[in-house]
Amino acid sequence: MKVFIAVFALIAVAAAEFTVSTTEDLQRYRTECVSSLNIPADYVEKFKKWEFPEDDTTMCYIKCVFNKMQLFDDTEGPLVDNLVHQLAHGRDAEEVRTEVLKCVDKNTDNNACHWAFRGFKCFQKNNLSLIKASIKKD
């Protein structure tokens, strides 16, 4: 019984650590990733217009932002519970989870940048408005 309580407490603490990112958080993460990855200015302009070329620069930028938002882990892949919390915003969480799970796959080419980008592009294809609306304006 003590083990069960300890495991439950650990899960509760881990779940409590995730905080939905705000617009300000996203801007900070974008700036940090542009700087740390030396993203060229022409790419930054594309990203601002929600244009994401399918190349390593873009893919690693998406992974960097998702890592900072705690939506993706380089080993575990998409963090489904965190994605649901980030994207739900008053919507039915199970419906959001279903949409997220459609885009979760394995790291087939052993490249975390490609893995994060595949999930992003898959979800973006049918849910761009949900992604844009998910960033809290606090």
From Swiss-Prot:
<feature type="disulfide bond">
    <location>
        <begin position="60"/>
        <end position="113"/>
    </location>
</feature>
<feature type="disulfide bond">
    <location>
        <begin position="33"/>
        <end position="64"/>
    </location>
</feature>
<keyword id="KW-0325">Glycoprotein</keyword>
<keyword id="KW-0085">Behavior</keyword>
<feature type="binding site">
    <location>
        <position position="61"/>
    </location>
    <ligand>
        <name>(9Z)-hexadecenoate</name>
    </ligand>
</feature>
<feature type="binding site">
    <location>
        <position position="30"/>
    </location>
    <ligand>
        <name>(9Z,12Z)-octadecadienoate</name>
    </ligand>
</feature>
<feature type="disulfide bond">
    <location>
        <begin position="103"/>
        <end position="122"/>
    </location>
</feature>
<feature type="binding site">
    <location>
        <position position="30"/>
    </location>
    <ligand>
        <name>(5Z,8Z,11Z,14Z)-eicosatetraenoate</name>
    </ligand>
</feature>
<dbReference type="GO" id="GO:0007608">
    <property type="term" value="P:sensory perception of smell"/>
</dbReference>
<dbReference type="Pfam" id="PF01395">
    <property type="entry name" value="PBP_GOBP"/>
</dbReference>
<feature type="glycosylation site" description="N-linked (GlcNAc...) asparagine">
    <location>
        <position position="127"/>
    </location>
</feature>
<dbReference type="GO" id="GO:0008289">
    <property type="term" value="F:lipid binding"/>
</dbReference>
<keyword id="KW-0732">Signal</keyword>
<feature type="signal peptide">
    <location>
        <begin position="1"/>
        <end position="16"/>
    </location>
</feature>
<dbReference type="GO" id="GO:0005615">
    <property type="term" value="C:extracellular space"/>
</dbReference>
<dbReference type="InterPro" id="IPR036728">
    <property type="entry name" value="PBP_GOBP_sf"/>
</dbReference>
<keyword id="KW-0964">Secreted</keyword>
<comment type="subunit">
    <text>Monomer in solution.</text>
</comment>
<comment type="function">
    <text>Involved in modulation of blood-feeding behavior and capacity in female mosquitoes. Required for normal oviposition. Required for normal fecundity and fertility of female and male mosquitoes. Required for normal expression of VGA1 gene, which encodes the egg yolk protein vitellogenin-A1. Involved in regulation of spermatozoa development. Required for normal female longevity when mosquitoes are maintained on regular sugar meal. Binds long chain fatty acids.</text>
</comment>
<protein>
    <recommendedName>
        <fullName>Odorant-binding protein 22</fullName>
    </recommendedName>
</protein>
<comment type="similarity">
    <text>Belongs to the PBP/GOBP family.</text>
</comment>
<keyword id="KW-1015">Disulfide bond</keyword>
<feature type="binding site">
    <location>
        <position position="61"/>
    </location>
    <ligand>
        <name>(9Z,12Z)-octadecadienoate</name>
    </ligand>
</feature>
<dbReference type="InterPro" id="IPR006170">
    <property type="entry name" value="PBP/GOBP"/>
</dbReference>
<feature type="binding site">
    <location>
        <position position="30"/>
    </location>
    <ligand>
        <name>(9Z)-hexadecenoate</name>
    </ligand>
</feature>
<dbReference type="GO" id="GO:0005549">
    <property type="term" value="F:odorant binding"/>
</dbReference>
<comment type="function">
    <text>(Microbial infection) Facilitates shedding of dengue virus type 2 particles into mosquito saliva. Does not affect dengue virus type 2 replication or infection prevalence in midgut and salivary glands at 14 days after blood feeding.</text>
</comment>
